[in-house]
Regions:
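WD40-repeat beta-propeller superdomains and closely related acidic/aromatic-rich repeat-like regions
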Residues: 1-384
């Protein structure tokens, strides 16, 4: 028997291009068809792009010139162009505050949007000015902190500052609701689509069978909470199931203190059947902030992003069974969101402009105080 071939060395993902943007973005998502990218912005709009694959350049084969005595001088090397462009489409408007949550329907060309004033809406994604399919301006009393869609596309789950977790049909009809004991910061569907997990201000995570109207197993993520003097500091930001629903991940921050919140990015892994915590990771120190988003790659690893103090951000690849990420990129500042293209070959990160030093920055020559903005960084994952 011949010896097995050694595993190919890991090749880090390659940044193809950073696409500029004039506003800060909270979240970005590729459509399931892969043809669109949408992002929720901090001025009450949804930004849209068409994902355009460039044709591969043709290669000219030069025939030998026997009469040439001297080789032609070498031309300066041109910077490599991105094989993909994000072509801007008109914004979607009619929202308030921050558009912090969006979700695509897994089959229909439909986008669901939630804002920080409590509005929930569904709209088409194609066309210059698509009209909403439906809107609910009072889906929650204030801030909708998280929006999730079931894998079968039948239901939406929302949670908010009003302590409610609500289940809706994707046609906008309220199906079930549960009032938690604290503000709810995250919600996600289990793969079968009939159960959700939600997590609150103090890091208590609960399973809820919304069809049977029954609460189920609880998980202790209280390390993602801190009572700092009179302030409850909430660190939970991300909930997601992996391994076909056998494992639940909870991500966010282990707060170091209140006020100007600092904390270390943290990720917890739980066994769903027993509620037992299996793993716990810290990705830096107090200035590094939060794990703000996670995407599951088909090859079994996670793509995580973090954001902390101005200029502090990480993109990481982590295998759930390992102690450390096998790839870390610190060149992209304050990563708010990550979305994996459906082909698994590319991902996009909504981040922050560099030199985003907040209050105290110098004015421009004409006396303007420039706000921050969120470039969208497009990466290509090398084939193994």
């Amino acid at each position: 028997m011949s010896d097995p071939k050694p595993a190919a060395p890991f090749v880090p993902p390659k940044e193809l291009k950073a696409f500029p943007n004039d506003r800060q973005l909270c979240i970005a998502r590729f459509s399931p068809c892969g043809n669109f990218l949408a992002a929720g912005a901090m001025e009450g709009t949804v930004r849209r792009w068409k994902v355009v694959e460039k044709p591969k350049p043709t290669v000219d084969i030069a025939l030998p010139d026997e009469t040439a005595k001297k080789p032609a001088p070498k031309a300066a090397k041109k910077p490599e162009e991105s094989p993909v462009e994000l072509v801007p489409l008109p914004h979607l408007t009619g929202f308030n505050g921050w558009v912090q949550n969006i979700a695509f329907h897994p089959k229909d060309k439909l986008l669901f949007v939630a804002d920080t004033w409590g509005k929930l809406a569904a709209t088409d994604i194609e066309g210059d000015a698509p009209k909403p399919r439906w809107e609910n301006a009072t889906a929650h009393d204030g801030w909708i902190r998280k929006l999730a869609i079931s894998p079968d596309g039948q239901h939406l789950a929302t949670c908010g500052r009003d302590q409610f977790v609500r289940i809706w049909t994707t046609a906008g009809k309220l199906v079930a609701e549960h009032r938690a004991e604290e503000d709810v910061f995250a919600v996600t569907f289990a793969p079968e689509g009939k159960v959700v997990a939600f997590g609150d201000l103090k890091g208590s995570i609960t399973m809820w069978d919304f069809e049977a109207k029954q609460l189920g197993r609880k998980f202790d993520a209280s390390v993602l909470h801190k009572l700092s003097r009179l302030q409850n500091v909430a660190g939970l930001r991300v909930l997601t199931f992996i391994d076909g629903g056998k494992t639940l991940l909870a991500g966010g921050c282990e707060p170091a203190g209140g006020g100007f919140v600092e904390g270390a990015p943290a990720l917890l892994r739980f066994d769903v059947a027993t509620g037992k915590q299996l793993s716990e990771w810290r990705f830096g120190v107090a200035k590094d902030g939060f794990v703000l988003d996670a995407a599951s790659h088909p090859d079994g690893y996670l793509v995580l992003v973090t954001s902390g103090q101005p200029g502090s951000g990480k993109i990481m690849f982590l295998r759930p069974g390992e102690k450390e990420p096998f790839f870390t990129n610190t060149a992209v500042a304050n990563c708010h969101s990550v979305t994996l293209h459906p082909d698994g070959k590319r991902f996009a990160v909504a981040a922050m402009n560099k030199a985003s030093n907040g209050n105290g920055r110098q004015l421009t020559k004409d006396g303007q105080y420039l706000g921050n903005n969120s470039p969208v960084h497009l990466f290509e994952i090398s084939a193994a």
